[in-house]
Amino acid sequence: MSDDHRRSVSSVPTVHLLGAFALHTGGETIPLPVDSRRLVAYLAVHSRPQPTAALAADLWPGVRPQAAARLLDEAVAGVDVPGLLAADDRGRLALGPGVATDLADAMLLIRALSASRIEQRPDVELLEHDILPSWTASWIAVERERFRQLRLSALERLSEGLTAAGRHEDAVQIARRAVSTAPSRERSRRALVEALLAGGDVAGAMHEYEEFQQLLRSSIGATPDSELDRLLVPHDSGWPLGPGLHRPIERWGVGMPG
């Protein structure tokens, strides 16, 4: 790679949304005013060009349209990074065509994981964090939850694929990432239990099962039937823990929330 190409790549603006907001260009972190940061984040989450009236209304809900439009103009003026923003012939705003975002990279990874057979453990660092978890604006909450569901499903599928491929240690590590994000999500916990059982760690699987049951008891006051029961209930004396070692847990006639 030539020095000119390296400089060109490093000067591409990159917007980070996963975990925390950051803007990098030319190898440096670029500070932005608060409203400019919110504008850039909004455009990074919504990749299509945005009409300015709707954009201002979303960014400043409850503010009169004229005042919101002024705030938007000020936010645009505060983005002093060449190529970061672009307007089309209808005046709609978007990030510039050369701008990179970690969210877009994460979505590419999610699509790749869903489209390919899993035999090796890929780098899933992009799937570790939510979109701007400390931000409370209503416009970000919907996109955050949508991405959260997508990344959890991707981690679960990856763990299940690694278990099927006999890569049990990798499967356990991936499933633990999902469980740490959503401890009460049954599919994440099931992927972890399956990986532990496949690797011969019956005690670890029982620990995860019992922790999940305790979490349900503390949150909803009961432990509804789940797929985990079918993984761990002894069918005969050949069950891995041996006869009589599984402690049955009382069931209640309730359904899972949501």
Task: Describe the function of each predicted region.
Residues 1-12:
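Basic, amphipathic DNA-recognition helix from helix-turn-helix-like DNA-binding domains
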Residues 2, 28-33, 45, 60-71, ...:
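Intrinsically disordered, charged and Pro/Gly-enriched terminal/linker segments
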Residues 13-16, 84-89:
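Short beta-strand
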Residues 17-37:
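A structural micro-motif at secondary-structure boundaries
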Residues 23, 55, 79, 205, ...:
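Conserved RecA-like P-loop NTPase ATPase core
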Residues 42, 58-62, 78, 82:
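Amphipathic alpha-helical regulatory segments at dimerization interfaces
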Residues 42-55:
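Short capping segments at the starts of secondary-structure elements
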Residues 73-84, 213:
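C-terminal flanking helix
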